[in-house]
């Protein structure tokens, strides 16, 4: 018999309602959300979901014997503090990214979890991005030969974001907020690099948020570059991959986020998150002197 997992949430904002609940609701036979805590729960703008208990009393959630796992989705600066409370209450914990503001904080939490025999993990849904999964499929096909270079881009034109922030905070920076998606993809697939080089900038000047980063990770002869900016009026391709025998370009990012923003939900639509053929990546390679160019069907992403 398959045990139903009973979980609770600390936080009731965009992360809980856009990135967690739609996928939990497709697995009602396996996962039950019992309680959602938020300090301002009675003023939250998100629609309440039937069958879930909403509370502004944290102890009610932490002391509930039925709840096995708690997901922390509060603002980044509160992740460490609340993950610690969850572990101290004897519950398994999943923490939204960025996980913590320092290595020391993260290590303390993992040590605490281990000492109590608890599972602690960071919520890394971006490992299940369709573009990233498709790049893996292309690499594993061997058609590119030895890999030389991988460029990953996560671009926006949102100058109003850095312009509205007038003080520097590590955990609220663009590097922590967005490189946690792309860097996790690199390290989860390629492992720990031989060495790394980073260029992180504050384009609006000292004391402001970092709003640009360019990170290079080296694996033998392979160089992986992770680049991002808030000031790119035309975004660069999501992935460009070069090997000794060819290249693969995937221009469009994973569709799941766009569908979720439009309330096009996975439990209502079988084509949720699916690319159209126009968005498929292009593979170009040399096979014994013959030029090949083909579209690669996108692997379905699944948060």
What residue ranges belong to the model's regions?
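Rossmann-fold dehydrogenase core element
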Residues: 108-125, 146-150
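Predominantly a Rossmann-like dinucleotide-binding segment in NAD(P)-dependent oxidoreductases
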Residues: 126-199, 203-206
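C-terminal glycine/acidic-rich active-site capping loop/insertion
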Residues: 245-303
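N-terminal Rossmann-like dinucleotide-binding module
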Residues: 2-49
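Beta-loop-alpha module in the N-terminal Rossmann-like domain of NAD(P)-dependent dehydrogenases
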Residues: 50-112
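Contiguous beta-strand/loop segments that form the cofactor/metal-binding neighborhood of enzyme cores
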Residues: 177, 183-266
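Hydrophobic residues in well-ordered beta-strands that form the structural core
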Residues: 56, 95, 120-122, 151, ...
């Amino acid at each position: 018999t398959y045990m139903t997992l009973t979980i609770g949430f600390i936080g009731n904002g965009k992360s809980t309602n856009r990135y967690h609940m739609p996928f939990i609701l497709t697995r009602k036979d396996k996962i039950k959300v019992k309680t959602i805590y938020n300090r301002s729960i009675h003023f939250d703008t998100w629609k309440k979901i039937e069958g879930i208990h909403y509370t502004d009393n944290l102890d009610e959630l932490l002391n509930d014997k039925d709840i096995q796992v708690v997901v922390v989705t509060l603002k980044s600066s509160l992740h460490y503090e609340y993950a610690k409370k969850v572990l101290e209450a004897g519950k398994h914990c999943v923490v939204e990214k960025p996980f913590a503001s320092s290595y020391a904080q993260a290590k303390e939490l993992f040590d605490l979890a281990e000492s109590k025999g608890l599972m602690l993990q960071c919520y890394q849904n971006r490992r299940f991005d369709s573009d990233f999964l498709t790049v893996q499929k292309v690499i594993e096909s061997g058609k590119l030969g030895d890999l030389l270079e991988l460029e990953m881009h996560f671009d926006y034109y949102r100058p109003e974001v850095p312009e509205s922030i007038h003080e520097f905070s590590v955990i609220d920076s663009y590097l922590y907020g967005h490189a946690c998606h792309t860097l996790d993809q690199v390290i989860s697939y390629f492992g720990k690099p031989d060495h790394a080089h980073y260029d992180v900038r504050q384009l609006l000047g000292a004391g402001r948020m970092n709003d640009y980063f360019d990170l290079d990770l080296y694996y033998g002869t392979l160089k992986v570059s992770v680049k991002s900016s808030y000031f790119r009026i035309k975004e660069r391709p999501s992935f460009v991959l070069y090997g000794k025998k060819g290249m693969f370009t995937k221009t469009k990012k994973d569709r799941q986020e766009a569908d979720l923003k439009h309330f096009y939900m996975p439990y209502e639509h079988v084509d949720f998150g699916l690319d159209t053929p126009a968005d498929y990546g292009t593979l170009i390679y040399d096979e014994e002197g013959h030029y090949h160019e083909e579209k690669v069907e996108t692997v379905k992403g699944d948060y």
